[in-house]
């Protein structure tokens, strides 16, 4: 008799077992030594509370609800919210977005699954720049696709030759995540423009458009006065996905959107397919309460200086210890090179010092490890001596 769980999902669970094992060990250390004695830099969970403007808007929505506020709503989202998002995007990109180009989703993860459901046939390929957000593998597999990795340089910037080599006649989409998880790098406009030219040529060569999916949940978490270039003006076949988990501190509320570039080939047809996907994947619609919230809190954001200060609090000491690390320009991650080639062994050595980080192998880049600085300053200060001890122990 075969097992009750589908073989494909069993395989996915096996591939994700390193995550489960890591968090099991973290829980054991906290239970044994006390949470206050463990430096947990493993989780990308936004630590900052929502801005006061968000809390005030929520109070208003809850205390003075409009009639019918909790009924079913359109699968694509509330029309007035979609129009608000479209106007915001038009202001940023100078492209003629309308409400019809917007599907409000259950976070960026929901938006990615909606997009891939609408795009992929069995056997199609999705290329992403490596290192990459670990869930991309599973999202592609959800819809019969296969994730293909295109390596980046030592600075984690786009390698156009590697990207071109990764594209085949089965390539349906390329996912770009900037600012990037796990590296924190921002891809500059000139690189993105060159990528667009490459994808236009590849689309012509293979006879169908390759869609560029811009995954941008960290767009508003950038440092040093930098900005994130808009991708849709650079490549017509772009889908923009994002969420308000990070900039508004609403990770648990699952509110984001998919924006279809107005000049996308068969844009109206794709929008209809995305709405259908949102429905039949079981999302149905994003939470109505938090949809209504968005236009009420335009311009609100968590204080990004908090994350920048923690980045700086880590960066200089780690380099002085001997760690090699590219300066993150956004998000809340560092992705140092492991002092030893085996990043998993390094992470285990760190656990012996009650220090929790994530092996780079899980992000497709062995020999590195990820630090999340979405923590308190006290956790950072407690972690630094442990980083130094581990570096000395492994012979870095």
What are the language-model segments listed below?
Residues 2-107, 114, 290, 297-304, ...:
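N-terminal small-domain helix-loop-helix segment of the aminotransferase-like
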Residues 38-40, 241, 324-329, 361-362:
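Short beta-strand
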Residues 236-308, 312:
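Conserved core segment of the aminotransferase class I/II
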Residues 288-295, 307-319, 325-337, 367:
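Conserved glycine-rich beta-strand-loop-beta hairpin in the small C-terminal domain of fold type I
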Residues 28-34, 92-94, 198-209, 262-268, ...:
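Alpha-helix termini
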Residues 87, 164, 299, 348, ...:
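PLP-dependent enzyme catalytic core of the Aspartate aminotransferase-like
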Residues 67-207, 219-234, 239, 380:
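Conserved core of the PLP fold type I
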């Amino acid at each position: 008799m075969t097992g009750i769980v589908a073989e494909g999902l069993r395989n996915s669970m096996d591939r994700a077992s390193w995550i489960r094992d890591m968090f099991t060990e973290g829980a054991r250390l906290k239970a044994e030594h006390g949470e206050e004695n463990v430096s947990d830099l493993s989780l990308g969970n936004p630590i900052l509370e929502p801005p006061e403007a968000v809390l005030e808007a929520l109070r208003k929505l809850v205390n003075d609800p409009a009639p019918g506020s909790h009924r079913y709503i359109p699968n694509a989202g509330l029309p007035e919210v979609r129009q608000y998002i479209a106007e915001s995007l038009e202001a940023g990109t100078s492209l003629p977005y309308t409400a019809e180009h917007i599907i409000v989703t259950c976070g960026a993860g929901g938006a990615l699954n909606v997009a891939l459901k609408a795009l992929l046939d069995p056997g199609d390929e999705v290329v992403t720049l490596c290192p990459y957000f670990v869930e991309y593998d599973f999202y592609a597999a959800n819809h019969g696709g296969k994730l293909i990795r295109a390596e980046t340089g030592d600075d984690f910037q786009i390698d156009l030759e590697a990207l071109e080599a990764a594209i085949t006649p089965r390539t349906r989409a390329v996912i770009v995540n900037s600012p990037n998880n796990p590296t924190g790098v921002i891809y500059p406009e000139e690189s993105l423009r060159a990528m667009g030219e490459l994808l236009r040529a590849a689309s012509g060569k293979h006879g169908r458009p390759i869609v560029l999916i811009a995954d941008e949940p960290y767009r508003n978490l950038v440092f040093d006065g930098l900005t994130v270039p808009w991708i849709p003006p650079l490549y017509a076949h772009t889908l923009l996905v994002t969420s308000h988990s990070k900039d508004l501190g609403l990770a648990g509320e699952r509110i984001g959107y998919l924006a279809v570039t107005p000049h996308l080939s068969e844009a109206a047809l794709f929008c209809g397919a995305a709405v259908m996907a949102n429905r039949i994947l079981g999302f149905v619609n994003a939470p109505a309460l938090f949809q209504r919230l968005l236009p009420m809190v335009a311009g609100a954001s968590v204080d990004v200086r908090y994350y920048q200060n923690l980045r700086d609090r880590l960066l200089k000491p780690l380099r002085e210890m001997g760690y090699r690390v590219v300066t993150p320009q956004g998000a809340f991650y560092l992705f140092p090179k492991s002092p030893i080639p085996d990043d998993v062994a390094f992470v285990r050595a760190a656990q012996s010092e009650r220090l929790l980080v994530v092996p780079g192998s899980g992000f497709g880049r062995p020999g590195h490890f990820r630090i999340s600085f979405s923590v308190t300053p006290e956790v950072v200060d407690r972690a630094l001596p442990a980083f130094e001890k581990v570096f000395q122990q492994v012979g870095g």
